[in-house]
Design a protein with these regions (language model features):
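N-terminal active-site beta-alpha-beta segment that forms phosphate/nucleotide-binding
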Residues: 1-78
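Conserved phosphate- and dinucleotide-binding cores of soluble alpha/beta proteins
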Residues: 4-8, 59-218
């Protein structure tokens, strides 16, 4: 089973972000998307620490220590980009002004519930950040995650067992094996990578999947 690399996943998500979109890239894996957005598309990247017009990762030696994203990673600012207060940034997030946010996840349920801030372990450090605000405020919520954990457990589940970030908020999931939409009738597989069959994907996924072509012809 050949999986996409982290950068290949970021490239795949970048292809689906439309011209003119206002997008927040969550901490961790989603920040890689900034490096693969096509130069001929005008896309506005937002960071909750107070940036709009964020660009890709700077080249080695060109880092500005005062220009970072919410994950404390060095970023660049595109022409026309701006800075603003943290409170204003969260008003943008909560007010429905972002078209898309891309978040990581520990689990996503078949109905689109999101769990991405705690595993519930007694020694876990709660770190919800702005994820709850994004989950309810963005018009579309995309999730980037590995299909399986290191222990081989699928992250797409019937019901989340970890503390929830948002209920029914996820629109689409990008894993290292497939692209899956969350619909009213359940998860719909839009794309499978590297020759994996639908049957093989279903075998490792503990929720009922529908293949997009079958769903559209029904």
């Amino acid at each position: 089973m050949q999986k996409l690399t982290r950068d290949e996943m970021a490239q795949r998500v970048a292809r689906d972000i439309p011209e003119g979109a206002y997008v927040n890239l969550g901490i961790g894996l989603p920040t890689r998307i900034a490096n693969y957005l096509p130069a001929d598309k005008e896309i506005f990247l937002h960071s909750e620490n107070g940036l709009l017009g964020m660009g890709p990762k700077p080249l080695p030696g060109e880092e500005d220590p005062e220009l970072i994203n919410a994950g404390k990673e060095y970023v660049t600012l595109l022409e026309g980009g701006c800075y603003f207060h943290h409170g204003d940034s969260f008003a943008m997030m909560r007010g429905g002004h972002l078209d898309i946010c891309v978040l990581g996840a520990y689990q996503v349920s078949a109905s689109g519930d999101l769990a991405n801030w705690s595993t519930g372990a007694p020694d876990a450090i709660p770190a919800v950040g702005g994820a709850m605000d994004l989950a309810i405020g963005a018009r579309q919520v995309f999730v980037m995650m590995d299909h399986l954990t290191r222990d081989g457990e699928c992250k797409l589940v019937e019901h989340c067992t970890y503390p929830l970030t948002g209920v029914g908020c996820v629109s689409r999931i990008y894993t290292d094996l497939a692209v899956i939409d969350i619909s009213e009738s359940g998860p719909v597989v839009r794309e499978i990578f590297n020759g994996l069959s639908f049957e093989e994907l279903q075998r490792i996924t503990p929720v009922a999947l529908t293949f997009a072509q079958l769903a559209e012809s029904a």
